[in-house]
């Protein structure tokens, strides 16, 4: 309802970018966090928080593990809803639409920008999978860290998928 509020014309994307920039400038914690709602083919819904990683002419960009529940749901039903809320500003933005993967080259370009710890964590765990124990994942993480000895983890390929919602 941005346009209905008379905020800066009738371009909701431009208004969203202004509000996002305001939240960043005001150092609102987790200003880039968004609730992502997906639905399985049968209609069962789920929601979780992910981070906005960019905005381009095709939409909003976020990254996820293709094997996770959200990755599987987006593959089977490529529609989603997103919601941002900036506490203290009384602002929220809701986005609904289709989701698509970007090219493998775009996904590969993102991987090296992730902090090393995040790379290791993504490679050591299978998001949304049941764990036998926390120690199991910590052991995998430590083993990868030893093997790579300070180098960045190579992109695991299928582990990370870049999705766009528009």
Model-derived features with residue positions:
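Binding-site signature for planar aromatic cofactors or substrates
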Residues: 1-166
């Amino acid at each position: 309802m941005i346009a209905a509020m008379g905020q800066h014309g009738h371009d909701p994307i431009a208004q969203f970018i202004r509000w996002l920039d305001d939240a960043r400038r005001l150092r609102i914690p987790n200003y880039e966090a968004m609730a992502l709602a997906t639905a399985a083919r049968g209609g069962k819904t789920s929601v979780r928080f992910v981070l906005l990683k960019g905005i381009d002419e095709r939409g909003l960009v976020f990254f996820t593990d293709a094997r996770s529940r959200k990755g599987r749901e987006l593959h089977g039903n490529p529609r989603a809803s997103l919601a941002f809320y900036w506490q203290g500003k009384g602002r929220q933005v809701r986005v609904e639409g289709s989701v698509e993967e970007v090219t493998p080259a775009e996904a590969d370009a993102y991987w090296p920008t992730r902090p090393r710890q995040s790379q290791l964590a993504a490679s050591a765990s299978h998001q949304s999978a049941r764990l036998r124990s926390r120690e199991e994942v910590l052991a995998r993480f430590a083993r990868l860290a030893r093997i790579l000895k300070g180098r960045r983890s190579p992109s695991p390929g299928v582990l990370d998928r870049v999705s766009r919602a528009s």
